[in-house]
Amino acid sequence: MARIAGINIPDHKHTVIALTSIFGIGKTRSQSICASTGIAEHVKISELSEEQIEQLREAVAKFTVEGDLRREVTLSIKRLMDLGTYRGLRHRRGLPVRGQRTKTNARTRKGPRKPIKK
């Protein structure tokens, strides 16, 4: 297994799909990484040479991924909550942040139904 950005990349998958197992790299960014390094998208990770894997490591290192990205997202949410913005309050209360309705639906964000006590 190749190790890129601290993640074990699955050998049996194609390069484009395998790179998406890194947090912060989706399909589009994965395709652009393959294009910039000159590695074909349909080649499996196990078929790549050590030099090509090193090229992928360098290309991925240019982006904010994994732990740094998770930390950045967490800190930005915490900043919103500390400032007391509307979005921060919605995060704090565990409600939908982006304007979705909450009279019905929003069960994923609100959690399971709570019975009405008589």
From Swiss-Prot:
Function, in words: Located at the top of the head of the 30S subunit, it contacts several helices of the 16S rRNA. In the 70S ribosome it contacts the 23S rRNA (bridge B1a) and protein L5 of the 50S subunit (bridge B1b), connecting the 2 subunits; these bridges are implicated in subunit movement. Contacts the tRNAs in the A and P-sites.
Region listing for Disordered, in residue ranges: 91-118
An example molecular function term from Gene Ontology annotations: rRNA binding
PANTHER family assigned to the protein according to its UniProt record, in alphabetical order: 30S RIBOSOMAL PROTEIN S13/40S RIBOSOMAL PROTEIN S18 (PTHR10871), SMALL RIBOSOMAL SUBUNIT PROTEIN US13M (PTHR10871:SF1)
Stored Pfam families: Ribosomal_S13
UniProtKB keywords: Ribonucleoprotein, Ribosomal protein, RNA-binding, rRNA-binding, tRNA-binding
Name of the featured protein: Small ribosomal subunit protein uS13
Subunit structure: Part of the 30S ribosomal subunit. Forms a loose heterodimer with protein S19. Forms two bridges to the 50S subunit in the 70S ribosome.
Superkingdom as given in the UniProt entry: Bacteria
Coiled-coil residue windows: none
Gene3D superfamilies membership: 1.10.8.50, 30s ribosomal protein s13, domain 2
Gene Ontology biological-process annotations: translation
Family assignment from sequence similarity: Belongs to the universal ribosomal protein uS13 family.
Listed InterPro entries: Rbsml_uS13_C, Ribosomal_uS13, Ribosomal_uS13-like_H2TH, Ribosomal_uS13_bac-type, Ribosomal_uS13_CS
Organism of provenance: Serratia proteamaculans (strain 568)
Gene Ontology cellular-component annotations: cytosol; small ribosomal subunit
